[in-house]
């Protein structure tokens, strides 16, 4: 079985295809691994960065991992693609995300935030059970 921790990471073929497409458009592309030193890596290159094409899933097993690169880019005043740190933080908290979209009138299914030991309450089967802080299908079996 594939390791769920890496379920959202892009494979080498996708990274190469995006790199090639950007280079065909005349971009000088440099791939930067997202590791514990990502702030330093961005800071030392910031004078030469026109845009960070942010496709990172961030640091392994960190709840706010997707917000790290956009946060650092904003702090260093480096333009980047994708969502803001606040958006990434809100989308990783499913209850908050559902409340935000419901407030704006987007229909959303009823939900209940559960912690170990909680009772099901008034929800009935069929149900979708999803970890509150994961993206895509991580945590669903």
Each language-model region and where it sits:
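ATP-binding N-terminal substructure of ATP-dependent carboxylate-amine bond-forming enzymes
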Residues: 1-79, 115-118
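Active-site nucleotide/adenylate-binding loops and adjacent lid/helix of ATP-dependent enzymes
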Residues: 45-46, 89-141
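Hydrophobic beta-strand scaffold residues
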Residues: 29, 79-80, 108, 127
């Amino acid at each position: 079985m594939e390791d769920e921790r890496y379920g959202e990471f892009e494979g080498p073929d996708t990274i190469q295809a995006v790199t090639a497409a950007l280079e065909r458009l005349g971009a000088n592309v440099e791939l930067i691994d997202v590791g514990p030193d990502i702030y330093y890596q961005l800071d030392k290159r910031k004078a030469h960065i026109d845009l960070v094409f942010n496709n990172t899933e961030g640091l392994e097993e960190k709840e706010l991992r997707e917000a790290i690169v956009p946060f650092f880019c904003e702090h260093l005043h480096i333009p980047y693609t994708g969502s803001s740190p606040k958006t990434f933080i809100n989308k990783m908290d499913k209850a908050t995300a559902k409340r935000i979209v419901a407030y704006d009138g987007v229909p959303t299914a009823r939900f209940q935030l559960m912690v170990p030991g909680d009772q099901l309450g008034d929800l009935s089967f069929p149900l979708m059970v999803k970890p509150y802080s994961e993206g895509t299908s991580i945590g669903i079996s």
